[in-house]
């Protein structure tokens, strides 16, 4: 599953309760069966949701402002990205290509290398199914002992690994 939310270390000075999910509210944390992030609050179900930078997901991830939504893939918006079983980039001009989990990027820039992706400003680099998003930076390792790290406030969980820091994105395959 994209979000097996097995939570690793959390760098929060606030309250944290995570039986099956986590809710972060700048920098407070409450748990549900998923995770939700909203400016920088976080709430989710079996996936992750972030808002402003907002992200919401079910079996995938959705981010908004920069917004991202995904099912078995990932979608980012503003820079916006939406995913299906492949990857589609629409960045002014728009770019589309198919990949493993599908991703759609819209603005500002996207560069793709092999199964990896390089997204600039906010920047995203994707190599295999791993992802790193910076400013608020996000690092996402989809197949590797999944873990997520959110900085400011910071979050670390193991499901698909994600690191959100400040907004740049890089995807890496941990194969």
Curated annotation (Swiss-Prot):
Domain of life, per lineage: Eukaryota
One of the record's GO molecular function terms: structural constituent of cuticle
Sequence repeats: 17-20, 25-28, 31-34, 38-41, 44-47, 51-54, 57-60, 64-67, 70-73, 77-80, 83-86, 91-94, 99-102, 106-109, 134-137, 144-147, 151-154, 158-161, 165-168
Coiled coil spans: none
Record protein name field: Cuticle protein 16.5, isoform A
Presence of keyword Membrane: no
Organism per entry: Locusta migratoria (Migratory locust)
Keyword Repeat part of the UniProt annotation: yes
Protein keywords: Cuticle, Repeat
Free-text domain note: The tetrapeptide (A-A-P-[AV]) repeats found throughout the protein are also present in many proteins constituting the protective envelope of other species.
């Amino acid at each position: 599953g994209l979000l097996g939310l097995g939570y690793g270390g959390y760098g929060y000075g606030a309250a944290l309760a995570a039986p099956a999910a986590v809710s972060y509210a700048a920098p407070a944390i409450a748990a549900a069966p998923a995770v939700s992030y909203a400016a920088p609050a976080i709430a989710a179900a079996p996936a992750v949701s972030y808002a402003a930078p907002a992200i919401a997901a079910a079996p995938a991830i959705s981010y908004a402002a920069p917004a991202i939504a995904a099912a078995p893939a990932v979608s980012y918006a503003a820079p916006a990205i939406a995913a299906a079983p492949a990857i589609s980039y629409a960045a002014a001009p728009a770019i589309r290509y198919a990949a493993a989990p599908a991703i759609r990027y819209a603005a500002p820039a996207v560069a793709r290398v092999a199964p990896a992706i390089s997204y600039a400003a906010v920047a995203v680099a994707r190599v295999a199914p791993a992802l790193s998003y910076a400013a608020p930076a996000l690092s996402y390792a989809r197949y590797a002992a999944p873990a997520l790290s959110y900085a400011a406030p910071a979050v670390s969980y193991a499901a698909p690994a994600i690191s959100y820091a400040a907004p740049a994105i890089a995807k890496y395959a941990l194969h």
